[in-house]
Amino acid sequence: MRRYEMICVGAGPAGLAAAIEAAKHGVQVIVFDENDRPGGQLFKQIHKFFGSQEHRAKERGFSIGNSFLNEAKELGVEVSLNSVVLGIYENGAMNVMVKDRIEQVMAQKTLVGTGASENMIPFPGWTLPGVIGAGAAQTMANIHGIRPGNDILMVGSGNVGVIVSYQMMQAGSRVAAVIDAAPEIGGYAVHAAKIARTGVPFLMSHTIKEAHGSDRVEGATVIQVDDSWEPIAGTEKRFEVDTICIAVGLNPMTQLLRMAGCKTAFVPALGGRLPAHDLNQETSVKGIYVAGDVSGIEEASTAVIEGRIAGLAIAHSLGYLDEPSFREQRTQQYASMKGLRSGSHGEQRGKAKEYLNAVMKGTMNAL
């Protein structure tokens, strides 16, 4: 059995940030990721980040990912790809499938940064080829250079929906419309404005009624909904499309954490059932930490900061970082996080995180 001081499950922005922060202080770290390349969602993000320079504004996601990989390599972080963690057991033991063999490893501290999967919605024809998640479309276009379709209907107007719509147009596809059952656009205005300027219609208070086609998508019908989300008869509109992209939110991938016995709570504002954790990102199971979308759906910049906080906490708990230095550096990360949890969207997520912290402390009951 191989033993490590710290194991990171997931080589996305949260996992890499945690690994880098811990390794800076001397912690021995290995990162396992099921994919054949590290970086998580960053390498699909060809758009520029916005906000402050501190949060990598005006940099594209893939360039940020490359900088993380280079820094991790320089610090001696080991990255094991095509490696699936099958389970986390007592005392930090894990089973990992590395390519075609199963290995047993053990960690003094574990960081779970497994991210999230895409939500889907059922409707007549939803299993036809051509109905795909928006994230899958983004992977096809930005990672593999394959255009998902020629004519696309986007279901969902959150950040993922509007960003991927624009990227599909950059890839040469036509976006027939962006629809959403909500009455207002959910994505940031800076992203939605790019779509609006191209003339693509936003149909708010609309949902998809049916996908048409026999062996593939050949069209889609949408319908308006009322304030109670009920379809309004006679408001149907048909679009001739060959692809329907679904962008209706993400679901945190908490399977390993639930297997390990971590306390959870249901928090709709952050994506569903999540691991309760303290301000150091540590869960109810001592030695298991979380960061990124698995601990609540937020931005990539937030995932990075959470990863850094967890990395600092792990370095401190292993004796590599003294108390004053730990508190000072953690305070700096909290201050950086505060800027991301401002505004209407950010404040809501911040309050939801406070609830998870309260569940962890036992001052509130989990739903």
How would you describe each model-predicted region?
Residues 67, 72-88, 94, 169-258:
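A Rossmann-like FAD-binding core segment of flavoenzymes
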Residues 1, 317-367:
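Glycine- and aromatic-enriched mobile tails/lids
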Residues 141-145, 185-191, 211-212, 274-278:
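Short, charged, surface-exposed secondary-structure boundary motifs
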Residues 5, 108, 176, 242, ...:
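Conserved acidic residues
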Residues 1-9, 66-151, 227-234, 245, ...:
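FAD-binding core/adjacent interface of flavoenzyme oxidoreductases
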Residues 4-63, 148-191, 266-271:
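Beta1-alpha1 glycine-rich phosphate/pyrophosphate-binding loop at the start
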Residues 133-141, 243-295:
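FAD-site-proximal beta/loop scaffold in flavoenzymes
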Residues 291-329:
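A conserved FAD-binding loop/helix module that cradles the flavin
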